[in-house]
């Protein structure tokens, strides 16, 4: 099987309980990654049909091999924002449930050549898909100091954004910043270490979000996804960043106010302390679930 780094699915039990309302329905994991949630759902609900989608060709190759013998799972490569088109190509109108697990996969985070990792030196890439034209290298080496500071502050929520952006612009006057370790070391020298978390963590997060236009993609995707959800169907979203969660929360609130359905999670669902201890990468995860249609009971 493809050498792909798997990770534990976050809040898997809660997702399985909140997402599935029809045990013979059609469900989509639109950010399938290494197939953690997808595998659990397919095993738990053998009479249901599942579609796993991912934009990353490495993930799709792995998923295709992993689920080759699983009759109720189909794997497709694509962007979750294009879900209506993907379903149309499969001659499917609407589905019973959709899962979005936002953010970065463990494989992407740890693979040096993908350019996401602070610990493993690699090119400044950070693209979820090799089809994308813009890389983190282009952003780091071509944006103005003001533009860089804005990205780092907005998407990384980094208070020292201006100081870091200035250091980047000064450094690239000598030579372009080409690798993840060059950028990580520059940030560390500029702001120093505070605690155990690497000082470049928020900078890398900001560049990843900007490179992949993650927030724009989410804004476009949610109303499109809602269209292909059946009455009574459920949309579950796991976010890891306050800006992502804010977008999801606002859409769900607006839909409920417009009478389009109910928020099944009035209060955001978070992983237990036990899960965080077992899987530290889940610590910032937030789960929200919306049920389309009027008259359902809250879980």
Swiss-Prot record:
Q: Provide GO CC annotations from the record.
A: cytoplasm
Subcellular location field: Cytoplasm
Q: Which Pfam families does the entry link to?
A: Methyltransf_5
Keyword DNA repair in the entry? The reply is: no
EC numbers: 2.1.1.199
Q: Which residues form a coiled coil?
A: none
Mention one GO biological process in which this protein takes part, according to its record: rRNA base methylation
Its recorded reaction(s) are:
cytidine(1402) in 16S rRNA + S-adenosyl-L-methionine = N(4)-methylcytidine(1402) in 16S rRNA + S-adenosyl-L-homocysteine + H(+)
Entry annotated with the keyword Cytoplasm: yes
List the PANTHER family. Answer: 12S RRNA N4-METHYLCYTIDINE METHYLTRANSFERASE, S-ADENOSYL-METHYLTRANSFERASE MRAW
What does this protein do, in the record's words? Specifically methylates the N4 position of cytidine in position 1402 (C1402) of 16S rRNA.
To which protein family does this belong? Belongs to the methyltransferase superfamily. RsmH family.
- Official protein name in the record: Ribosomal RNA small subunit methyltransferase H
Q: Say which species the protein is native to.
A: Coprothermobacter proteolyticus (strain ATCC 35245 / DSM 5265 / OCM 4 / BT)
